Amino acid sequence: MEHTGNKTENTKATALITAVHRERYEILVEQETSDTKLNARLKTGVYYQDKGGEAFPTVGDRVRIQTNRCGDALILETLPRTSVFYRENPTPGMERQAVAANFDYVFLVMSMNHDFNQNRLDRYLTAAWESGATPVVILTKKDLCEEPEYYVNLVERQAPGVAVCAVSAVTGEGMEHVQRYLGAGKTVVLLGSSGVGKSTFVNALCGETVMDTGAIREDDSKGRHTT
């Protein structure tokens, strides 16, 4: 579209939600030559009157936006999702909230220590399947586990057909098996309790420190919320 001298000229485009901060959204505008990062807000009349809470944009959503030459962006519509995670709204009477969308795989991250819990794994598997994506169980801290095969066998019996990767994000052992899920155009979300090594795992995947990490207690292998 050819621009004129009118600074308020509007252009419509498709964008990806990369972060949500209350009423402000960080978006990546898809263009032919390069992508542009912008801040955006919702078109109030559309989202607060015509749509329920489930339709509010979340990380991973593709949305239709309207921009002007000043760099202002307005989110007009949330495009159909291929997968989505929901959480219950803490406000009584309000609809559940979408927290992540359009991912291909759900990495169910569990550590091979005292924190491993089969009931929790069942809940994770159910959530992953209900999201519409494919679950992959990531067993972390292989370098600290004397019998990783024990945990792998437990998962394989509990979730037949689900891929299992036993890894050490510290030594890199087993990380090559994870790479097959990270091809071009693929998106992954991580699900796991505190202290299982999600931040360390992400840093290992990225090859650099992109997330802070925290220590766990030795007596029960519990961790602090870092990711």
PLM-predicted stretches and their roles:
Residues 208-227:
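Switch I (effector-binding) loop of TRAFAC-class P-loop GTPase G-domains
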Residues 12, 185, 208:
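Short coil/loop residues immediately preceding or within conserved phosphate-binding loops
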Residues 194, 199-200, 204:
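Walker A/P-loop
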Residues 72, 132, 161-163, 210:
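A generic structural signal for alpha->beta connector loops
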Residues 99-104, 108-160:
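Phosphate-binding glycine-rich loops and their immediate beta-loop-alpha structural context
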Residues 134, 141-196:
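Canonical P-loop GTPase G-domain recognition
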Residues 1-118:
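N-terminal accessory targeting/assembly segments
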